[in-house]
Amino acid sequence: MIRLAVPEDFTSIMSIYAYARSFMQETGNPNQWGNHFPPEELIHNRIRNKQLFVLEENGTLHGAFAFIIGEDPTYLQIDDGSWLSDAPYGTIHQVASDGTIHGFFSQIVDYCWAQIPHLRVDTHADNQIMQHLILKNGFERRGIISVSYTHLTLPTKLE
């Protein structure tokens, strides 16, 4: 079940992100999150702002992700492409799991799609696993965005 994260989830969420960072490094993506992303303060802010969600099964958290409806400053400039639509959209960020739930990203997409019909998601050029999952779930590459800490490839949801 996907639900909003609450402050009591913080320790479990940070453990999930630690596992995800380790997995990313082991699978050829050591630079996207390094050793410290996402920082604790960002997670606290996401929880406070009701922008962080978790996947919970039988009382155990298995995944976390940020979902924000509204304009995302990182998507204002797109290179080598264009957006499919200028309609209001939701953005999926900071997807992480403990590796025990098959189809977690598909569940995220279904959950977010039910909230707003236009979605955007991005990932690092080295994150081949996430790129595969994004494309598998009906997104297409739309261009390249730049953020302060890295250069990301950017797909967006097909309409």
Language model feature labels by segment:
Residues 122, 140-149:
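Conserved catalytic-core motifs of GNAT/GCN5-like acyltransferases
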Residues 1-15:
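A short beta-loop-alpha structural element at the N-terminal edge
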Residues 115-125:
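Conserved GNAT acetyl-CoA-binding A-motif
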Residues 100-114, 131-132, 136:
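Conserved acetyl-CoA-binding loop-helix of GNAT-fold acetyltransferases
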Residues 21-41:
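Conserved GNAT-fold acetyl-CoA-binding loop/helix
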Residues 126-143:
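Conserved active-site alpha-helix within GNAT-family acetyltransferase domains
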Residues 66-100:
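Conserved acyl-donor/pantetheine-binding loop and adjacent beta-alpha core of acyl/acetyltransferases
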Residues 150-156:
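Conserved small/polar residues in nucleotide/adenosyl-binding loops
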